[in-house]
């Protein structure tokens, strides 16, 4: 779509003629769905599979020990900007650690230049290096025993982010930021303010 083409151009790539990227007319499709993404409720995926997705309103208000905005899938510049809009002027809940690992140095530098990284720091976040790290269960920040985490990563299989006894919920950066403030799985719409992106 136009949004994708604009992004490709913004990072110096030629989107080419993407208008030709579609299914063959005779392709057999099992089902065809059209969704209005703006009308969808924020989703979370319960442990231990991304397939366990449900509207955030249907999820229990599970307390979270760690809120993680990171990885190549959930900490790009736009993700950081959106999460910061929830966190601006707020602080993480007592007992909940917010960790932020921007997806790339370019995104981190841009976010820093625009004051976004400062919003994370002021909210009590710990900034981690641009690396797979906790997402892949590497390093000192991997999840410990019986830790409950809400994460903007793409996978939440048992033991992927650390100890096999940890529980990882997947969510958007908006939902992760809201949950860091609430100290539990929270609907980000409770925290949006006038002028915030939806």
Language model region names:
Residues 1-198:
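Fe-S-dependent hydro-lyases/dehydratases of central metabolism
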């Amino acid at each position: 779509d136009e949004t994708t083409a604009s992004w490709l151009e913004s990072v110096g790539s030629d989107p080419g003629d993407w208008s030709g990227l579609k299914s063959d007319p005779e392709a057999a499709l099992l089902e065809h769905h059209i969704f209005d993404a703006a009308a969808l409720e924020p989703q979370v995926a319960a442990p231990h599979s991304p397939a366990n997705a449900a509207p955030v309103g249907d999820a229990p208000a599970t307390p979270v020990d760690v809120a993680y905005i990171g990885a190549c899938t959930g900490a790009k510049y736009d993700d950081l900007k959106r999460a910061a809009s929830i966190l601006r002027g707020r602080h993480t809940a007592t007992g909940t650690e917010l960790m932020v690992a921007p997806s790339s140095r370019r995104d981190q530098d841009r976010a820093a230049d625009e004051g976004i990284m400062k919003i994370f720091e002021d909210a009590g976040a710990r900034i981690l290096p641009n690396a797979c790290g906790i997402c892949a269960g590497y390093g000192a920040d991997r999840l410990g025993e019986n830790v409950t985490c809400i994460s903007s990563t793409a996978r939440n299989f048992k033991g992927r982010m650390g100890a096999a006894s940890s529980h990882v919920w997947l969510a958007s950066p908006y939902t992760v930021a809201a949950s860091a403030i609430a100290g539990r799985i929270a609907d980000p719409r409770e925290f949006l303010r006038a002028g915030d992106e939806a």
